[in-house]
């Protein structure tokens, strides 16, 4: 820990200019994501999700991107978790993707909506069976006395659904879509003069403005 102030890395892998990007940030994200996959990065769909309660108290955690379309960025969780509670009170969020070997970040801000129930159900049934049971067994973000309590909950779920061909989706579990109003692409550059290109719009249905930000 004594060397924290001396930890640094020079970035010189690539550059980013207006000539390098598309007019649509969703398409630009897809292009960068494909490059992250081609580079065989571990879990390139891992992203920081930041939410805030109505009093402004923030919270952040790593979740996985599980879908992307013209509406925005999809993830799934327990609606009664800390993030679910935050989003029910304050439907705004920020996402950050870090692809360190490529010296890249993508930062997203936007409004958040629940995905339609049928989409959540379809994705739920594509999950491993154990993960489906876990969604029933875990009272996410609540205090539990011990790990044994969780295992007991799981045993109860197995007893109820173990012989069923299909486990129903819990009503407290499902998907969200972050509808972006701002998307920033960051490329590391020498001397900390990084490239930052930001797309922004005033509402999720508006036109995009592209601008360069100082690092």
Swiss-Prot record:
Pathway: Cofactor metabolism; pyridoxal 5'-phosphate salvage; pyridoxal 5'-phosphate from pyridoxamine 5'-phosphate: step 1/1; Cofactor metabolism; pyridoxal 5'-phosphate salvage; pyridoxal 5'-phosphate from pyridoxine 5'-phosphate: step 1/1. Catalyzes the oxidation of either pyridoxine 5'-phosphate (PNP) or pyridoxamine 5'-phosphate (PMP) into pyridoxal 5'-phosphate (PLP). Belongs to the pyridoxamine 5'-phosphate oxidase family. InterPro entries: Pyridox_Oxase (IPR000659), Pyridox_Oxase_CS (IPR019740), Pyridox_Oxase_N (IPR011576), Pyridoxamine_oxidase_dimer_C (IPR019576), Split_barrel_FMN-bd (IPR012349). Binds 1 FMN per subunit. Homodimer. One of its GO terms (molecular function) is pyridoxamine phosphate oxidase activity. Keywords: Flavoprotein, FMN, Oxidoreductase, Pyridoxine biosynthesis. FMN binds at residues 61-66, 76-77, 82-83, 105, 140-141, 186, 196. One of its GO terms (biological process) is pyridoxine biosynthetic process. Gene3D superfamilies: Electron Transport, Fmn-binding Protein, Chain A. It is an enzyme of class 1 (oxidoreductase). Transmembrane segments: none annotated. Substrate binds at residues 8-11, 66, 123, 127, 192-194. PROSITE patterns: PYRIDOX_OXIDASE (PS01064). This is Pyridoxine/pyridoxamine 5'-phosphate oxidase. It catalyses: pyridoxamine 5'-phosphate + O2 + H2O = pyridoxal 5'-phosphate + H2O2 + NH4(+); pyridoxine 5'-phosphate + O2 = pyridoxal 5'-phosphate + H2O2. HAMAP family: PdxH (MF_01629). Its cofactor is FMN. It holds the Pfam family PNP_phzG_C. Its EC number is 1.4.3.5.
């Amino acid at each position: 820990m004594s060397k924290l102030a001396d930890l640094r890395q020079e970035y010189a892998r690539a550059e980013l200019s207006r000539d390098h990007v598309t007019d649509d940030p969703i398409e630009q994200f897809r292009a960068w994501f494909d490059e992250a996959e081609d580079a065989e990065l571990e879990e390139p769909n891992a992203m920081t999700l930041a939410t805030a309660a109505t009093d402004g108290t923030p919270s952040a955690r790593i979740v996985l991107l599980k879908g992307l379309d013209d509406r925005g960025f999809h993830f799934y969780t327990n609606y009664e978790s800390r993030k679910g509670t935050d989003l029910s009170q304050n439907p705004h969020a920020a996402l950050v993707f870090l692809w360190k070997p490529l010296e890249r970040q993508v930062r997203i801000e936007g409004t958040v909506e629940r995905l339609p129930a049928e989409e959540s159900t379809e994705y739920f049934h594509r999950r491993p069976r154990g993960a489906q049971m876990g969604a029933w067994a875990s009272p996410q973000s609540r205090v539990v006395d011990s790990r044994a309590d969780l295992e007991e909950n799981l045993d109860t779920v197995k007893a109820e659904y173990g012989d069923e061909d299909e486990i129903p989706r819990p009503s407290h579990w499902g998907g969200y879509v972050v509808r972006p109003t701002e998307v920033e692409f960051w490329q590391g550059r020498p001397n900390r003069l990084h490239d930052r290109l930001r797309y922004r719009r005033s509402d999720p249905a508006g036109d995009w403005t592209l601008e360069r930000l100082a690092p």
